[in-house]
Amino acid sequence: PWLDASNLQMTDEEYFDIIERKLPKVIAEKEKINKIYRNLLPESIQMGDDFQNWRFMIVIENRQKVLDAIFKAGLFAGTNFPSVSYMFKGVSSPVAEVEAKHIVNLFNDFRFSEAQARKICDVINSVI
C-alpha cells in the first residue's frame, strides 16, 4: 500500500541506504518529465523551478475546466495545495487563499510516463 503505516522490517540505516541508491534514478525521472512540461506548457502558467520538485506546479484561471479535460482524457493531476490559512487559526491570508484555488500539480514520477506528460500538455494547452 502507498501509505503503509506498519513498522519497517529493516534498520534505519538499511532504509536510508535504499533511498540513497534510488534517489539518482528518481531525480533523473522527475527531470525528464519536468523538461517535457517546461518545453510544452506556456511559461506564464509554470511556477518557478524551486517549486517543481514534489510535482510540477502550474497556476491556471480555469482549474476545474482543465481538470475535467485531464480526467476525461484518462489522465490524472492533483489539486492538493491548500491555502496556508488553515495552519494559522484566525489569520486571514487572502492572497494564499486565492492562489490555492488556481494551482494544479502535475505528476512527474515513475507513475507518469513521458507519453502521458506530452498528452497532458496537449490537453492543458487545448483548454487554457
Q: What does each model-identified segment do?
A:
Residues 1-128:
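PLP-dependent aminotransferase class I/II
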